[in-house]
């Protein structure tokens, strides 16, 4: 016991250097000292719990379908509802974080999302499942306070790494739930419950954990380096901001006022365009991740078939000649298509899980790359890191679409996943610089862009799944490569990628 006490005391005793605004200049992963590292670990753990519960229904869907006699359409629509719910919520949560602080908002999301999760066992039909997952989608909004929290606690030199780590490790909950929920389900069955009762009891467990965490963080963590949100230090106003709100007007000439007004208007225009581009690009990385997670195992089953297996074509043509319904044709096609696959459902899911497991380090890798280039190239370095990761993602998606063997597909899939999640890390290493007074709003908008992208990609998948599933990944790759070029038009703190080349030319002139 004494050893444990000494260990905990050591974790709390580590001092962290801070800047003039009170933000941490150091990152000590194995410390839980308040306020910085306590906030870091709290935000990532809460986000992890939110993702675990958000997707907690998915592993139990086969049993739920069996009990409620649900169609594939019901299940597909419930999945769309789960993602769609977070789009508007992420936009709303951002301003709420600016107003009340990340701690209270994170607590509110966990407590609110735990209620429908705990009541999941009461649903009776497909409509009930759709409505249920719509409300459980509240938990998807936890991403915004998670990123907001670390942006408030860490300064510009390490905020990219901090944001990437909490985001990536939080996303791991989406993979962990496919291990956790089946284990709870089997444990309840082992205790004597039948499978229909077991899933209803199993969903209560993550709901209970979310509820406990939602209450606990109110008393064990801080909103900002100063503690409560009301004591936070606001970003320093520039002379421009001061002129706009009317202070020091007497010190300015009329010409200076007009210049400031035009400058502010130009700055706001660039802010809007930058936020829009980041929303689009987050849809090209996080949106791709969410969409890929929902279709990847099916793609592998469709793609890799036993050579010469034509059972599907024969039986489908026979069914069509007999005049059966479209629904029967589709079900027959799906069953035979799986029969011809080299993989079974378990092995396909195992391979597909690799895509999500890269969150353990890949998102942080993107943030670290952004921080490293920032030290040498300043803000243009962050923009270059962002564009390189997106371009790499696009190239790997195109290569993956052309793979015809399972080993090569696994290798390219893993590399592609690293680029996808690294791009997510570089995206949110840029967010704190867009408008420092509105980090929460911008984080919410960008996060909503990711979910919007996921819905768009899933809609395209529906159109291509029966024609050429590989084309879906090819289209994604082309879109991502094109979207990466938009980075050239991002302007943050009056800096673009082009400023790097201008500075190089200026240095050469000075040397001459």
Regions found by a protein language model. Give the residues of each.
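Cytosolic juxtamembrane N-terminal segment immediately preceding the first transmembrane helix
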Residues: 1-52, 267
């Amino acid at each position: 016991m004494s050893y444990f006490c000494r260990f905990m005391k050591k974790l709390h005793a580590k001092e962290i250097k801070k800047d003039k605004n009170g933000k941490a200049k150091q990152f000590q992963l194995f410390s839980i000292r308040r306020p910085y590292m306590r906030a870091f670990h709290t935000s990532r753990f809460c986000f992890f719990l939110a993702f675990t519960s958000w997707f907690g229904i998915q592993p139990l869907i086969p049993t739920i379908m069996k009990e409620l006699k649900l169609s594939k359409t019901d299940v597909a629509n419930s999945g769309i509802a789960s993602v769609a719910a977070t789009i508007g919520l992420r936009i709303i949560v951002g301003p709420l974080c600016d107003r009340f602080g990340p701690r209270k908002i994170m607590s509110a999301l966990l407590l609110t999302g735990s209620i429908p999760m705990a009541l999941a066992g009461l649903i009776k039909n497909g409509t009930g499942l759709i409505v249920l997952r719509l409300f459980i989608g509240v938990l998807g909004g936890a991403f915004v306070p998670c990123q907001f929290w670390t942006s408030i606690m860490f300064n510009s030199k390490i905020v990219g790494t901090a944001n990437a780590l909490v985001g990536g490790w939080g996303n791991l909950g989406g993979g962990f739930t496919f291990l956790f929920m089946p284990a709870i389900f089997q444990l309840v069955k082992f205790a004597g419950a039948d499978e229909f009762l077991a899933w209803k009891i199993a969903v209560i467990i993550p709901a209970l954990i979310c509820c406990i965490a939602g209450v606990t963080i109110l008393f064990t963590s801080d909103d900002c380096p100063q503690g409560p949100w009301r004591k936070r230090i606001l970003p320093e106003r520039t002379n421009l901001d001061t002129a706009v709100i009317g202070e020091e007007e007497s010190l300015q000439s009329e010409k200076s006022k007009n210049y400031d007004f035009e400058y502010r208007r130009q700055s706001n225009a660039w802010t809007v365009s930058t936020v829009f581009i980041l929303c689009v690009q987050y849809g090209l990385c996080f949106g791709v991740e969410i969409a890929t997670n929902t279709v990847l195992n099916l793609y592998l089953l469709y793609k890799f078939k036993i050579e010469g297996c034509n059972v599907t074509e024969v039986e489908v043509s026979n069914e069509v000649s007999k005049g059966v319904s479209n629904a029967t044709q589709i079900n027959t096609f799906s069953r035979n298509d799986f029969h011809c696959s080299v993989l079974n459902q378990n092995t396909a899911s195992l391979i597909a899980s690799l895509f999500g497991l890269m969150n353990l380090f890949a998102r942080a890798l993107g943030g670290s790359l952004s921080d490293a280039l920032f030290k040498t190239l300043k803000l243009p370095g962050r923009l270059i890191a962002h564009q390189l990761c997106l371009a790499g993602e696009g190239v790997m998606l195109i290569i993956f679409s052309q793979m015809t063997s399972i080993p090569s597909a696994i290798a390219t899939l893993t590399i592609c996943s690293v680029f996808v999640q690294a791009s997510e890390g570089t995206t949110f290493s840029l967010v704190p610089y867009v408008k420092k007074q509105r980090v929460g709003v911008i984080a919410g908008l960008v996060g909503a862009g990711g979910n919007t992208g996921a819905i768009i990609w899933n809609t395209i998948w529906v159109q291509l799944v029966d024609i050429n599933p590989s084309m879906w990944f090819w289209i994604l790759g082309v879109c991502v490569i094109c979207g990466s070029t938009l980075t050239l038009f991002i302007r943050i703190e009056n800096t673009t990628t082009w400023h790097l080349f201008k500075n190089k030319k200026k240095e050469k002139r000075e040397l001459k």
